[in-house]
Regions:
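N-terminal helix initiation/capping motif
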Residues: 1-35, 42-43, 100-115
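Short conserved beta-strand and strand-loop elements enriched in small hydrophobics
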Residues: 15-21, 53-66
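A residue-level detector for short acidic-glycine micro-motifs
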Residues: 32, 74-76, 90
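Short, solvent-exposed secondary-structure boundary/capping segments
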Residues: 39-42, 78-89
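Surface-exposed connector loops and short turns at secondary-structure junctions
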Residues: 44-55
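A short macromolecule-binding patch
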Residues: 50, 93-102
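Mid-chain, well-packed structural core segment of small domains
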Residues: 60-80
Length: 115
């Protein structure tokens, strides 16, 4: 039996986002999103640091011309990618909401599914 602490529904939606980790800008793709956060996938080949040190630290997220702050809550390795769970900081939530709304509105394929 597993206990899921998520309080909001996740949506599987790939969005290209860059993250700044320890001063290094890395490209990633969201695995799933919610109004309060995201799961970002990054190739393990791109990450040159130990991620244990970034837990509960603030990171910068970059999407097109938008810059947001988030906190790393968890990470795991899945095949050749790191999955990093990030909660969006309060001051960045209006920006994150605009990004989510834009992507959900423009997804014409109808293939957006709950994560």
């Amino acid at each position: 039996m597993s206990f899921d602490r998520r309080c909001l529904k996740r949506v599987a939606l790939p969005i290209a986002i860059k993250i700044v980790l320890a001063g290094e800008r890395l490209a990633g793709i969201t695995r799933d999103i919610s109004p309060k956060g995201l799961c970002l996938e990054i190739s393990t080949l791109r990450v040159k640091m130990n991620l244990l040190g970034i837990l509960n630290t603030t990171v910068t997220l970059i999407f097109e011309n938008e810059i947001m702050s988030g906190t790393v809550r968890w990470y795991t390795v899945e095949e050749a990618t790191y999955q990093i769970g990030i909660s969006i900081e309060r001051q960045s939530k209006p920006t994150w909401k605009r990004i989510i709304d834009r992507h959900l509105r423009h997804d014409l394929s109808g293939l957006v599914k709950p994560a």
